[in-house]
From Swiss-Prot:
<dbReference type="InterPro" id="IPR004665">
    <property type="entry name" value="Term_rho"/>
</dbReference>
<keyword id="KW-0378">Hydrolase</keyword>
<feature type="binding site">
    <location>
        <position position="154"/>
    </location>
    <ligand>
        <name>ATP</name>
    </ligand>
</feature>
<dbReference type="GO" id="GO:0016887">
    <property type="term" value="F:ATP hydrolysis activity"/>
</dbReference>
<dbReference type="InterPro" id="IPR011113">
    <property type="entry name" value="Rho_RNA-bd"/>
</dbReference>
<comment type="function">
    <text>Facilitates transcription termination by a mechanism that involves Rho binding to the nascent RNA, activation of Rho's RNA-dependent ATPase activity, and release of the mRNA from the DNA template.</text>
</comment>
<dbReference type="InterPro" id="IPR041703">
    <property type="entry name" value="Rho_factor_ATP-bd"/>
</dbReference>
<dbReference type="InterPro" id="IPR003593">
    <property type="entry name" value="AAA+_ATPase"/>
</dbReference>
<dbReference type="InterPro" id="IPR000194">
    <property type="entry name" value="ATPase_F1/V1/A1_a/bsu_nucl-bd"/>
</dbReference>
<keyword id="KW-0547">Nucleotide-binding</keyword>
<dbReference type="GO" id="GO:0006353">
    <property type="term" value="P:DNA-templated transcription termination"/>
</dbReference>
<dbReference type="InterPro" id="IPR012340">
    <property type="entry name" value="NA-bd_OB-fold"/>
</dbReference>
<feature type="domain" description="Rho RNA-BD">
    <location>
        <begin position="1"/>
        <end position="68"/>
    </location>
</feature>
<dbReference type="GO" id="GO:0004386">
    <property type="term" value="F:helicase activity"/>
</dbReference>
<comment type="similarity">
    <text>Belongs to the Rho family.</text>
</comment>
<keyword id="KW-0804">Transcription</keyword>
<keyword id="KW-0694">RNA-binding</keyword>
């Protein structure tokens, strides 16, 4: 969108320019204060070649971001909205659940406005885990607008997501230039911000933040200051801004971003990118190559995975139970811990049955008799 006019672009073209774009006049932009990223539902008319019209002009506007145009005029800018800690939990362990989503819900609960990062070495099942989380959120929370953003991914992964995930899939495959990666990511972020300004709950599942940062590093003008791994000192500012946009908004609306970060690839650049994003999220899910090598999935390192301020998402009862379970798992290796939890989850239907099933493991796992008695009483 320019100062004089704009275009409506379709998700079928990944919001890039095409011959099917719809022309929006300057008067309409000023009247309804339309911004970049607004989703508009309206009426178009056939272009008149005699007047030099090449695109379908927008004749009438019915809705902007699912709201009446008159109500959108007075909306607050995204920057002026007050961010809060996530306090409404995504129910990803109730209906249409998988073993992976139950484990995530236990150890790294997700809330509306979460800024989560899935740390994953190659071939540990990060894309599969992301797909399962997406399907569970879409099924249990139809009020949430779900966007799956695939950057620098394989074409077959894109097709798999489009066919098996109930959400909007926006992508730029690895054979596309870095400029396209950046454009697609920017328009998705702008769309999400505009929807949040109108009070909607939006979830972006990004695969991956590492490749997006690589794309920004390629297109950003050099500052003359190069970090280890060949990363420009200013190149990570924009991907940080993308990831940092996730927040829970006071008085309604939220933007949740769950992104994957790739590690242990042998690339120094990937390690530098991960270190830059390591402390920016408020939820971290760590995947372990040792677990994946033993063909145990989901390959989650339970002791290294957690959510900050989880007391806002869990009830006091569940919080106490989780504290005791973590104390039990602290004595185990990552492989033993996930195997222990997975075995018991497969035999139970809900949380209550799961908590009862681990009572039998208390005596053999807790050495101190005093600690054992206290934990048995609490569980």
């Amino acid at each position: 969108m320019t100062d004089k006019y704009g275009f409506l672009r379709s998700s079928y073209t990944n919001y890039l320019s095409s011959s099917k774009d719809v022309y929006v006049s300057q008067s309409q932009i000023r009247l309804f204060r339309i911004k970049t990223g607004d989703t508009i539902r309206g009426e178009v008319r056939t272009p008149n070649p005699k007047k030099g019209e090449k695109y379908f002009p927008l004749k009438r506007i019915f809705q902007i971001n699912g709201r009446f145009p008159t109500s959108v005029i007075k909306r607050k800018s995204f920057k002026k909205l007050t961010p809060l800690f996530p306090n409404e939990k995504f129910q990803i362990s109730k209906r249409k659940v998988t073993l992976s989503t139950r484990i995530v819900d236990f150890f790294s609960p997700l809330g509306k406005g979460q800024r989560g990062i899935i740390v994953a070495p190659p071939k540990t099942g990060k894309t599969t885990l992301l797909k399962e989380i997406a399907n569970t959120i879409a099924y249990n929370h139809p009020e949430v607008y779900l966007i799956i953003l695939l950057i620098d991914e394989r074409p077959e992964e894109v097709t798999d997501m489009q066919r098996n995930v109930n959400g909007e899939v926006v992508y730029s495959t690895f054979d596309e230039p870095a400029e396209k990666h950046v454009k697609v990511a920017n328009i998705v972020l702008q769309k999400a911000k505009r929807m949040v300004e109108c009070g909607h709950d939006v979830v972006i599942l990004l695969d991956s933040i590492t490749r997006l940062a690589r794309a920004y590093n390629t297109v950003s003008p050099t500052s003359g200051k190069i970090l280890s791994g060949g990363v420009d000192s200013n190149a990570l500012q924009k991907p940080k801004r993308f990831f940092g946009a996730a927040r829970n908004i006071e008085y309604g609306g939220s933007l949740s971003i769950i992104a994957t970060a790739i590690i242990e690839t042998g690339s120094k650049m990937d390690e530098v990118i991960f270190e830059e994003f390591k402390g920016t999220g408020n939820m971290e899910l760590q995947l372990d190559r040792k677990i994946a090598n033993k063909r145990i999935f989901p390959a989650i390192d339970l002791n290294a995975s957690s959510t900050r301020k989880e007391e806002f998402l869990l009830t006091k009862y569940n919080l106490n139970k989780m504290f005791l379970i973590r104390k039990l798992l602290a004595e185990m290796t990552s492989v033993e811990a996930i195997d222990f939890i997975k075995t018991r989850l497969m035999k139970t239907k809900n949380n209550q049955e799961f908590f009862k099933s681990i009572k039998s493991s208390i005596k053999s796992s807790i050495k101190s008799s005093r600690d054992r008695e206290n934990i048995e009483k609490k569980i």
